[in-house]
Amino acid sequence: MISPIKNIKNVFPINTANTEYIVRNIYPRVEHGYFNESPNIYDKKYISGITRNMAQLKIEEFINEKSRRLNYMKTMYSPCPEDFQPISRDEASIPEGSWLTVISGKRPMGQFSVDSLYHPDLHALCELPEISCKIFPKENSDFLYIIVVFRNDSPQGELRTNRFIELYDIKREIMQVLRDESPELKSIKSEIIIAREMGELFSYASEEIDSYIKQMNDRFSQIKARMSVT
């Protein structure tokens, strides 16, 4: 089971250069040993130092960039509507689109990944009113983190977030059951099983969900056809 951590409901603006504190502020249960490690190549975009707990925040790349991103997010922020309408997958196909559709009130929940816990967008999001994030490491990756961003002012926000996490675990369990299959086949089979409900959680239009599932089924058929030839 993954162990996501929800950020504090109201994360206050950070007036410190302590690189350990700013991460714990949004991800309280991060392992202590994480800060004794050297910054990875992605962290180095935002901090500099021998270890993370001894590092300094970069003025332009983190502090100023977070301020710019937070100002932009505030201009795009909208209170939660009473009803949500389906969105196109294209609107959420990149990280900014994923969180922008949430903070602008188009949908109650979205998901994206960051390559560093010092990513300015992540820290800016956590300072917005009625916006929360759940964070957990991406499986089989040394640096990626999955961020589930959701609305606190809609009951659908956390409900959908929790169900997303359940489906994520289900997919992992399916892939474990299929451990003797090829990585490609495991990925497609598990995706087909959860694709419809996952698409509905993300508020995608039903016709786009249908199209995506057909695409996955076609890929599955192509793989099976190749395997039958060999």
From Swiss-Prot:
It catalyses: L-cysteinyl-[protein] + S-adenosyl-L-methionine = S-methyl-L-cysteinyl-[protein] + S-adenosyl-L-homocysteine + H(+). One of its GO terms (biological process) is methylation. Keywords: Host cytoplasm, Host nucleus, Methyltransferase, S-adenosyl-L-methionine, Secreted, Toxin, Transferase, Virulence. It holds the Pfam family NleE. It is found in: Secreted; Host cytoplasm; Host nucleus. One of its GO terms (cellular component) is extracellular region. The keyword Cell cycle does not apply. Residues 49-52 are annotated as: Interaction with host proteins TAB2, TAB3 and ZRANB3. Coiled coil: none annotated. One of its GO terms (molecular function) is methyltransferase activity. Its EC number is 2.1.1.-. It comes from the Bacteria. S-adenosyl-L-methionine binds at residues 92, 98, 107, 111, 204, 208. The keyword Mitochondrion does not apply. Monomer. Cysteine methyltransferase effector that inhibits host cell NF-kappa-B activation by preventing nuclear translocation of host protein RELA/p65. Acts by mediating cysteine methylation of host proteins TAB2 and TAB3: methylation of a conserved cysteine residue of the RanBP2-type zinc finger (NZF) of TAB2 and TAB3 disrupts zinc-binding, thereby inactivating the ubiquitin chain-binding activity of TAB2 and TAB3, leading to NF-kappa-B inactivation. Also mediates cysteine methylation of host protein ZRANB3, inactivating its ability to bind ubiquitin chains. NCBIfam families: NleE_fam_methyl. Belongs to the NleE/OspZ family. This is Cysteine S-methyltransferase OspZ. The gene is ospZ.
